[in-house]
Amino acid sequence: MKKAYETAMINHGGRNGEVEAPNGSMHMKITPPGIHAEGTNPEQLFAAGYASCFNGAVQHMIKTAESTVKARVSLYNLDDGGYQIGVVLEVHIDGISEEEAQKIAEDAHEFCPYSKATRGNIDVEVTIV
């Protein structure tokens, strides 16, 4: 396997802190989920990354049509006191049938690096909207 790209982010303070790119291109305040404070949280950042990556995979499959992907990331309480995330990817592709869109979404799910990374680790549902 040949590395195509690498990036890094640095966090200070965990879920009540900040995250920044070492090159200074990004800096954000981090807050726990459900807190109505200025900032974002790890679940929102994961949703942003997954939606962008998955839509990139969809675009790779369709080439010409417009598409949108909404990633809904949920945080679940586990019986052991821990947490688990789950994802629903809502895919819309302009100008094609639901059956065609479903096939493209399935192919994108096999191609997307986020889907590959999460496969077998968390529940991911792909739906056509």
Language-model segment annotations:
Residues 1-48, 55-129:
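Extended beta-strand/beta-hairpin segments
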